[in-house]
């Protein structure tokens, strides 16, 4: 090493060697966050050179970065002039300012080593191929000198690559290790830009056949396929494929948030995050869908939305083959196979597969509902629920069923509806084998086996297996009946009660028996009717073993064993309850006046005389439960 330092034939590493370059096509493939990160890193490199006392030029790249412009130049501009500041000047054989700046001014790593060793000679001897082995070694002290400033380290299996250094040192190391030549801005008419090096060599990825013009770019790209992540965080052990990702990640541990919003004071650890946040204040939505015209604030949301039109689902589960549009959805799904429940509630000990589920659950303990609807003031525990609710006000229903044309405001509702047409019942109970179309119904059914009733009324302590029953029950205490019929003014405490009632006025009978075609107003009537076709008799008399299709028929039959009269003398003059036998509609129509009965014996005679007619009308006429 000492011999290398005293060799008079030396070469300095130029700024072009530590600069990441993009073609116009490559630049177009970067999103806004990646472009912003690129600008920040390159300007940070320049600032580092200045802080070390190194002369830094202001070529076209730096000028574009400082002004937020794209860091590529048109070929027409390159063929006319050359370096910035030379416009209008005749060609000369003398080196230009740009040439001197690039070839002589930036000897960053040479000067960095000089400052550490005190040696006045810079650079390394250059062999016929452009680099010697000693030159690679010559850069090592410069890399090692940055070691203390970095938050991470190299994974042991990648020790040969050196330490996880700053962005500058990493770029230089890539170039030296991969054998790229050092380029200087050495001519005006060559048509080569110091930013875009149009090299004859083309490097192709064997996995995906993507083409790169530099070997280091290919090597960095190949990490995607190989999964190599040489940069490891010393705090949590997480690994990254690039040193820049490690630097960004380290701010999670330090809590550093240097980028502050001037509008609301919110701080961020990345400038790209601040830029995205500022669009909330400005209302800017630069990403517009060409299919439906919908605009988005963030590119990632825009890309995800586009997949709803194309149907693309790039994330496929290796276990079951199910595909997903986005990575978070895939990760959430994969936990189903692993059976892992890593998130535990400290209040009740309940465990969850996802952090979002835990946070949502914890709000049941705190009662916090931070997301409020600006239209109606209704509050929600999570933002997704608010977004889900807000569609009610807009009336938008973009998801239409191709089978029947019915439209829905959420994709999940459409998928759930389509199971009616397909007959799919993916949720099967392991206890009794019963299958269900919807997950919510399946969970509710399982509580019938376990006896779990997690929803408790604070007024009376009564518990329920589902939230809907608790809400319906609570209206008993409040007496509230917000749903009023516009036809007759009758009020109900449930929307479903109003809907069922309105069918009396409209005559609608949406429930049809597939066996005989008979229609009914309510689903309960259809279920009760279906037993006629199936012959099912689930209600059995414990005395004689006789079975009945309805509980009311069993109750009526059991009076034959008990000898209890349908109406006793003491019952006359007060309303009937659900536990008592109701007065038959046939008897009311025939004008039988039970209020004139004076003895219990007379009632028994009345019952015997109408026993036959009761059986005739029992199947066709409903019974009045109260008068």
UniProtKB/Swiss-Prot annotation:
GO terms for biological process: regulation of transcription by RNA polymerase II. Residues 135-160 have a biased composition (Basic and acidic residues). GO terms for cellular component: nucleus. Keywords: DNA-binding, Metal-binding, Nucleus, Repeat, Transcription, Transcription regulation, Zinc, Zinc-finger. The keyword Repeat applies. It is found in: Nucleus. May be involved in transcriptional regulation. This is Zinc finger protein 805. It comes from Homo sapiens (Human). The gene is ZNF805.
């Amino acid at each position: 090493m000492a011999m290398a330092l005293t060799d008079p034939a030396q070469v300095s590493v130029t700024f072009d060697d530590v600069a990441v370059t993009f073609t116009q096509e490559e630049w177009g493939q970067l999103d806004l966050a990646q472009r912003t990160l690129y600008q920040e890193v390159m300007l940070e490199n320049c600032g580092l050179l200045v802080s070390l006392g190194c002369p830094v030029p202001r070529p076209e790249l730096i000028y574009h970065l400082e002004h937020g412009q794209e860091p590529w130049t048109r070929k027409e501009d390159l063929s006319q002039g050359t370096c910035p500041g030379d416009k209008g000047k005749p060609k000369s054989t003398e080196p230009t300012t740009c040439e001197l700046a690039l070839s002589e001014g930036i000897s960053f790593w040479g000067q960095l080593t000089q400052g550490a060793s005190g040696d006045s000679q810079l650079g390394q001897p250059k062999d016929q191929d452009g680099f010697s082995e000693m030159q690679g070694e010559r850069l090592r002290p410069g890399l090692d000198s940055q070691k203390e400033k970095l938050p991470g380290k190299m994974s042991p299996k990648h020790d040969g690559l050196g330490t996880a250094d700053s962005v500058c040192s990493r770029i230089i190391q890539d170039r030296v290790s991969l054998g790229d030549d050092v380029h200087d801005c050495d001519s005006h008419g060559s048509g080569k830009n110091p930013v875009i090096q149009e090299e004859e060599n083309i490097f192709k990825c064997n996995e995906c056949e993507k083409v790169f013009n530099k070997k280091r770019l290919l090597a960095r790209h190949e990490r995607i396929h190989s999964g190599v992540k040489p940069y490891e965080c010393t705090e949590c052990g997480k690994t990254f494929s690039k040193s820049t990702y490690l630097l960004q990640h380290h701010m999670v541990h330090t809590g550093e948030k240097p980028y502050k919003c001037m509008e609301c004071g919110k701080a961020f650890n990345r400038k790209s995050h601040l830029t995205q946040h500022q669009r909330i204040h400005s209302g800017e939505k630069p990403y517009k869908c060409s299919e439906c015209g919908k605009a988005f604030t963030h590119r990632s949301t825009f890309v995800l939305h586009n997949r709803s039109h194309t149907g693309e689902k790039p994330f496929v589960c290796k276990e079951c083959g199910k595909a997903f549009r986005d990575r978070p959805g895939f990760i959430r799904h994969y936990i189903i196979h692993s059976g892992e429940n890593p998130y535990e509630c400290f209040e009740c000990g309940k465990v969850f597969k996802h952090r979002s589920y835990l946070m949502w659950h914890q709000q049941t303990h705190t009662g916090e509902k931070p997301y409020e609807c600006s239209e109606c003031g209704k509050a929600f525990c999570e933002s997704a629920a608010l977004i889900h609710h807000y569609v009610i006000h807009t009336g938008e229903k973009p998801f239409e069923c191709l089978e029947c044309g019915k439209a829905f405001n959420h994709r999940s509702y459409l998928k759930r509806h389509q199971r009616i047409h397909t007959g799919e019942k993916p949720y099967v109970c392991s206890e009794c084998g019963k299958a269900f179309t919807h997950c919510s119904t399946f969970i509710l059914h399982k509580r019938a086996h376990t006896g779990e009733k997690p929803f408790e009324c604070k007024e009376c302590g009564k518990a329920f297996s589902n939230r809907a029953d608790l809400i319906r029950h609570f209206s008993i205490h409040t007496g509230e009946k917000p749903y009023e019929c516009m036809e007759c003014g009758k009020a109900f405490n449930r929307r479903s009660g109003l809907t069922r009632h309105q069918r009396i006025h409209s005559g609608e009978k949406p429930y049809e028996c597939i066996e005989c075609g008979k229609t009914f107003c309510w689903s309960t009537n259809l279920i009760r009717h279906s037993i006629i076709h199936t012959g099912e008799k689930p209600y059995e008399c414990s005395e004689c073993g006789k079975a009945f299709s309805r509980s009311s028929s069993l109750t009526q039959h059991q009076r034959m064993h008990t000898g209890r009269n349908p109406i006793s003398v003491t019952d006359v003059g007060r309303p009937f309850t659900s536990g008592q036998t109701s007065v038959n509609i046939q008897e009311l129509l025939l004008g039988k006046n039970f209020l004139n009965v004076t003895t219990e014996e007379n009632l028994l005679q009345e019952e015997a005389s109408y026993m036959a007619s009761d059986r005739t009308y029992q199947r066709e006429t409903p019974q009045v439960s109260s008068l």
